[in-house]
Amino acid sequence: MKTPTGRFRVGEKIGAEMPSDTVFRNRIPLEPGDPLPPTEDLVMSRILWLDGLDEDNANTRDRFIYIHGTKHEDKIGLPDSHGCVRMRNVDVAELFKLVDEGTHVIIEE
């Protein structure tokens, strides 16, 4: 799926105080030794779960579209996710500290 564009807000912040190499499954941090999800597209570090504010992106939350960290930092900027916005783990951890739930976000092509 393509990353939706338009106006959004941060609906929920997940992962405060977690180590930057934390892997999440269904928004729950895995414990060391837990099996990794059966995907290469791991959600890591922090999650900013987006709510769509436009008619064209109103289903964003239901599609589980996040801004999140990744283990594939070399693919940042390439169309390689399932619709999420991937960031370097250190960068998404910093962004996480700077925004509150309800902060507005604009995603453009």
Q: Where is each model-derived feature located?
A:
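Electropositive
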Residues: 1-14, 18
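Exported/periplasmic cell-wall-interacting domains
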Residues: 2, 18-109
